[in-house]
């Protein structure tokens, strides 16, 4: 696991904060219903981001912030009927050097050529029983090569418990979960939504999925504006050691591992209706680098990542990793 410390310095150059990635959820619903989806997509209504509004928000943000890669995701981003316009809006804003689509791939063979011509890379998440056939994967690889687009995929056999409906009243536990959260501090999954900037997608999605209302949602972020002090306020927000309000219900990187499964919409929230303490693995929560190093040895290899091509499912490496996943996943059920 990569090392991080709260307050690690961000690179600031020419008046802008730099980060590896930034994310935009162009839709919030999905064509799959994965249990414990970190974005709570199974219970969120249909919502399509407006390309013009997105361009405006990202253009203003770009004056104070820049990312190497802007991730276009959801939900399932390919459900957006105006995806070509979304991609052009993102490119026009110049908030990032490259554009990357994250998808479950089910709609990828039908993705418009205009999108292939604009996107730089595509990342596919494959789930047991709900994945593209090898023939369709091969078709997607051919389309990517024709348009000089990088394409990778991951097989997910396990998910982590992502949030708790009940949450916790233990401020020390909330702090520990926040301190060891990969999304906030290691991967820095910065998210732009409705003119607001969030430290991670979960801080925006959890209050929405739990129907807590706009006030509970937006107090986790910072509103994007063109004021002279916005960059400094953004930097202060990003490096704050204080947990966000949504961290009370979020499990960060500490959730127990569970076998991936699809659930009905009405089942999604009830299965999360347990206290935080029941849904985390104690050994995945800590405040020291040593604790993080120990946690790495517990995490099952829940995905297989390729380089610039699609690895065939018959590859013996995948079989070995799946056996390891099955063994490691069993450790997290106790």
Tell me the role of every PLM-derived stretch.
Residues 1-101, 106-110, 277-286:
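Conserved alpha-helical substructure of the radical SAM core
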Residues 1-41, 219-226, 239, 243, ...:
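N-terminal pre-core extensions flanking Radical SAM catalytic domains
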Residues 10-11, 175-178, 234-237:
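Short, P/G- and charge-enriched loop/turn segments at secondary-structure junctions
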Residues 30, 34-37, 181, 189, ...:
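Disulfide-bonded cysteines in secreted/extracellular proteins and peptides
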Residues 80-208:
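Conserved AdoMet/S-adenosylmethionine-binding subsite of the radical SAM
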Residues 148-161, 202-258:
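C-terminal accessory region of radical SAM enzymes
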Residues 189-193, 255-260:
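Extracellular/mature segments of secreted proteins
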């Amino acid at each position: 696991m990569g090392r991080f410390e709260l307050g690690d310095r961000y690179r600031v150059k020419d008046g802008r904060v730099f980060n590896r990635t930034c994310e935009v959820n162009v839709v919030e619903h999905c064509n799959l219903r994965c249990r414990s989806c970190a974005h709570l997509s199974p219970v969120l209504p249909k919502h399509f981001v407006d390309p013009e509004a997105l361009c405006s928000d990202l253009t203003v943000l770009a004056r104070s912030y820049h990312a190497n890669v802007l991730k276009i995701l959801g939900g399932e981003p390919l459900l957006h009927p105006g995806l070509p316009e979304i991609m052009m809006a993102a490119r026009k804003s110049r908030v990032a050097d490259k554009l990357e689509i994250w998808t479950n791939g089910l709609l990828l063979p039908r993705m418009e050529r205009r999108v292939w011509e604009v996107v730089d890379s595509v990342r596919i998440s494959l789930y047991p029983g709900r994945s593209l056939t090898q023939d369709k994967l091969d078709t997607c690889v051919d389309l990517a090569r024709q348009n000089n687009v990088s394409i990778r995929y991951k097989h997910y056999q396990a998910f982590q418990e992502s949030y708790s409906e009940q949450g916790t009243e233990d401020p020390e536990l909330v702090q520990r979960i926040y301190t060891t959260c990969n999304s906030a501090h290691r991967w820095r999954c910065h998210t732009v939504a409705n003119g607001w900037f969030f430290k991670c997608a979960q801080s925006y999605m959890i209050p929405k999925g739990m129907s807590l209302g706009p006030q509970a949602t937006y107090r986790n972020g910072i509103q994007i504006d063109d004021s002279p002090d916005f960059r400094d306020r953004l930097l202060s927000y990003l490096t704050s050691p204080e947990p966000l309000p949504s961290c009370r219900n979020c499990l960060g990187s500490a959730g127990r591992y569970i076998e991936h499964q699809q659930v009905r919409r009405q089942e999604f929230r009830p299965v999360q209706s347990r206290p935080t303490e029941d849904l985390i693995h104690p050994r995945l929560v800590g405040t020291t680098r040593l604790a993080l190093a120990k946690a790495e040895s517990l995490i099952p290899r829940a995905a297989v990542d390729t380089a610039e091509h699609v690895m065939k499912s018959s590859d013996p490496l995948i079989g070995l990793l799946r056996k390891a996943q099955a063994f490691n996943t069993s450790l997290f059920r106790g």
